[in-house]
UniProtKB/Swiss-Prot annotation:
GO cellular component: cytosolic small ribosomal subunit
Residue span of region Disordered: 232-279
Highest taxon, organism lineage: Bacteria
UniProt keyword DNA-binding, yes or no: no
Family the UniProt entry places it in: Belongs to the universal ribosomal protein uS2 family.
Organism: Salinispora arenicola (strain CNS-205)
One Pfam family, short name: Ribosomal_S2
InterPro entries for the chain: Ribosomal_uS2, Ribosomal_uS2_bac/mit/plastid, Ribosomal_uS2_CS, Ribosomal_uS2_flav_dom_sf
GO molecular function annotations of the record: structural constituent of ribosome
Gene encoding the protein: rpsB
Name of the molecule in the record: Small ribosomal subunit protein uS2
Compositional bias annotation for Basic and acidic residues: 252-271
Keywords: Ribonucleoprotein, Ribosomal protein
Amino acid sequence: MAVVTMRQLLESGVHFGHQTRRWNPKMKRFIFTERNGIYIIDLRQTLDYIEKAYDFVRGTVAEGGSILFVGTKKQAQEAIAEQATRVGQPYVNHRWLGGMLTNFQTVYKRLQRMKELEALGDLSGTAAGYTKKETLQLSREKEKLSRTLGGLRDMQKLPAAIWVVDTKKEHIAVDEARKLGIPVIAVLDTNCDPDEVDYPIPGNDDAIRSAELLTKVVAAAVADGLIARSGRRRGTDEKPEAGVASDEPLAEWERELLEEPKKSDEPKSDEQPAAAAAE
């Protein structure tokens, strides 16, 4: 059974790219066609790349590695925190602090400080041995650390790979991972650079449902890897579905994505970015 179905991708809007005037020419090979000034991503390729990313994540986790989930844009924050927590992986869903990977020793010290403050208990009143002013300062420090580093509290070492929603927004995280040789798995919208990613998944990185579905797929791969790591057998080679598809009818042009591509629908090699109406 497939990790995720074509219908699920369509219903989550994974196929919608950016306006044709906002694109990266390197993404041409992932584009199926253009509709009303919007690029449509080839979901056949998306399915293939999802399989590759799934197998990589599963294998990495099965061998003892961890996956750092990264997505600080509003559309991805909830899914990143929810899915990473569900499978016990670290995550960053607020501002990425420079050096979170390349200067992890310092980050680790801050994590220990956060745990020390948490051990003090409730800081809403006056903590034992501290003045009211000191207690207020400690409370603010604890809140700040929890907001920025809370998702990393159990991370003891660098992750084996990172999962990213929106490589343009999270370019610092991607750059740090590349410097350290940490594989990057990411959603690639039509304005992204595929050369920056080791395991790309062509898709919409702006829609909430798209970010949620793809993050759920990565989390499912992590869960599968944890099962393999523990030595338990699933009893089947089938991969878990990321969700349940409905039976709502698809639009005619969406059905084209389920059929063989027509040559006329493929992006032309000399195609130039066309002007489109503002979003």
